[in-house]
Curated annotation (Swiss-Prot):
Source species taxonomy: Eukaryota, Metazoa, Chordata, Craniata, Vertebrata
Name of the protein in question: Pentraxin-related protein PTX3
Signal peptide as annotated in the record: 1-17
Function of the protein: Plays a role in the regulation of innate resistance to pathogens, inflammatory reactions, possibly clearance of self-components and female fertility.
Localisation per UniProt entry: Secreted
PTM statement from Swiss-Prot or TrEMBL: Glycosylated.
Cystines in this chain: 179-357, 210-271
GO molecular function: (1->3)-beta-D-glucan binding; complement component C1q complex binding; identical protein binding; virion binding
List of glycosylated residues: 220
Main location: secreted
Amino acid sequence: MHLLAILFCALWSAVLAENSDDYDLMYVNLDNEIDNGLHPTEDPTPCACGQEHSEWDKLFIMLENSQMRERMLLQATDDVLRGELQRLREELGRLAESLARPCAPGAPAEARLTSALDELLQATRDAGRRLARMEGAEAQRPEEAGRALAAVLEELRQTRADLHAVQGWAARSWLPAGCETAILFPMRSKKIFGSVHPVRPMRLESFSACIWVKATDVLNKTILFSYGTKRNPYEIQLYLSYQSIVFVVGGEENKLVAEAMVSLGRWTHLCGTWNSEEGLTSLWVNGELAATTVEMATGHIVPEGGILQIGQEKNGCCVGGGFDETLAFSGRLTGFNIWDSVLSNEEIRETGGAESCHIRGNIVGWGVTEIQPHGGAQYVS
């Protein structure tokens, strides 16, 4: 619409110019509108600036100016668009070339990757379907699963019971760790015992005594070892009273008891310690403190010259006399040691450890001190 109005005005001005001689066409210097970079070398022709323009003249001048501006604007826009289009074509061409070069050889790899992904997807779907079928089957058979689980648990219980049985058999049949021999007391008899001959005198102001015991039968008083003199047959005693352990120093009135610590048919490691200065007395069972007391036989000194025996108590001075069948031990003894000092807690634990029978006392040392069996007692391995 705007273009039609411009054309109409242009035709109308041409008709008026032909029929009228009164109007002189005036050309206006447009250098002030658009600077084309050309500057005149001569002075411009002076115009009749003082002449008044009619309304039509002003209209024509405005039309000419607007047409020129429009043509120049269209030309500039066309130039800009052409340049931009050319630049875009060049960039697209370069991009196409760069993409074409690496993609051409990579097409087979891309095809292989696509195929592998398809296979993986299919395998995943198949696995999901199989899992769903398994879950469905498992949901349909809860009772069967429960029975299978119960059978496994029962088998585990039986295995545990078998293991306990084997451990019990080993405890009954084997010697303690590190011990190669033991003395067997086959029955209770006043003739069955073992006589011990210390390597040093038994004059003691403190001592520690340890022994491994496996009893087959226990009464109210079953002697493990006993040391006594003619004056006092009960200087030192360690004996069993059913499942309890009794430790005596200086007489039967001085005793320490550890309740319910022994099981028949099983090896048990026992230690007793005592010192005269404080009367501190302790009983240890399998490396653990079972009982302790103070002021027991304080100031007492164990005299030398007595008789030391295992498996029996001698309450007389003469050979062959003073034995009591009810006091006799039946079972096995090993690892009997006596020290003339109080062992530390760690040392006591070591005497019942893997090398227990290789740790020897300085008064009585198992394996080096003479221990003579009597009346049917014998060394076994």
